[in-house]
Regions:
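Sequence-level motif detector for i,i+2 pairs with an aromatic at +2
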Residues: 16-20, 124, 254
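Short cysteine clusters
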Residues: 29, 33-36, 208, 228-229, ...
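Radical SAM enzyme [4Fe-4S]-AdoMet core and its adjacent flexible, acidic
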Residues: 13, 24, 39, 44-49, ...
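Short, intrinsically disordered/low-complexity patches at protein termini
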Residues: 101-103, 243, 249-252
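Cysteine/selenocysteine-centered motifs that mediate thiol-based redox chemistry or coordinate metal-sulfur cofactors
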Residues: 247-263
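Conserved alpha-helical substructure of the radical SAM core
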Residues: 1-116
Length: 263
């Protein structure tokens, strides 16, 4: 129902036993969303050869991932090799996925390469969108509607105000799936939105669904491998094997403090 919001912190499609792959191919963006950690990162792209090497590494370590998500803290379609990367993913037998802001004009280029995609849209109000740092709302809506006639589209909405319900109604009327995502509670996100700090009590014992179920591997712009896409302050990242060891003794890594996805 349109008045019932699906709340989720996941940004990936469902996965199988082999972990999916998410690659931060760019930190550049044509939006300036106040909640985005990427706006304070160095603005740059991942080299195509580096991406191809990471894909080969993942294949050798884990096998063919069910999904390779081309996204991080930037707008993926700004990368000049975005569709080339998607083609490479298909060539190895996987399925490319992305979450785009929907401003790319040549929407038809997605059809032969993608089985499904995500589009971010937080509000239907141009005024509210501008306050958030989002633009070209009519173009985004047109992008969603046109592409939804060719493939499943999921609209991702950050839970900021009542605008999420208006987006839910808009999606419901068009038969489009929507996922509403809360703001992250981690310090490496929170500094950008102190007025919206999520209120929740975190358990002392540490458990992480990404580590338990081996859901995915996230590769940031520098090629660093992590178990999820929520670790932005990599100085505190102890490494994948150390995180698994810490989980076994219910010890929370510093890089996971405040994370909504951990117990």
């Amino acid at each position: 129902m349109a008045d019932q919001l699906i709340i989720s912190s996941f940004s990936e499609p469902p996965v199988g036993q082999i972990p999916s792959m998410q690659v931060e191919i760019t930190t550049r963006c044509n939006f300036d969303c106040f909640y985005c950690a990427g706006r304070d990162m160095p603005q740059q792209d991942m080299d195509y050869q580096a991406f191809s090497g990471l894909l080969d590494y993942h294949l050798s370590q884990y096998g063919v991932p069910p999904v390779v998500s081309l996204q991080g803290e930037g707008e993926p379609t700004l990368h000049q090799d975005f569709f080339r990367m998607a083609t490479r993913v298909k060539d190895v037998g996987s399925r490319p996925f992305t979450i785009t802001n929907g401003t790319y004009k040549q929407w038809q280029k997605f059809i032969p390469l993608f089985d499904f995609i995500g589009v971010s849209m937080d509000t239907l109000s141009p005024e509210e969108a501008k306050k958030i740092g989002r633009y070209n709302l009519p173009r985004v809506q047109d992008f969603i509607e046109k592409l939804a006639t060719h493939m499943p589209v999921t609209v991702y909405t950050v839970l900021l105000s009542s605008g999420a319900k208006a987006v839910a109604q808009w999606c419901h009327e068009r038969g489009i799936r929507q996922i509403v995502q809360p703001l992250q509670g981690k310090p490496d996100y929170q500094y950008r939105y102190p007025q919206f700090i999520p209120r929740f009590i975190q358990k002392e014992d540490f458990s992480c669904v990404y580590l338990h179920q081996n859901l995915m591997r996230y590769y940031d712009l520098n090629g660093r491998e992590m178990p999820c896409c929520f670790i932005k302050d990599t100085k505190q990242y102890p490494g994948l094997q150390e995180m698994k060891r810490m989980q076994e003794i219910s010890q929370r890594p510093a890089c996971c403090t405040g994370c909504l996805m951990t117990g």
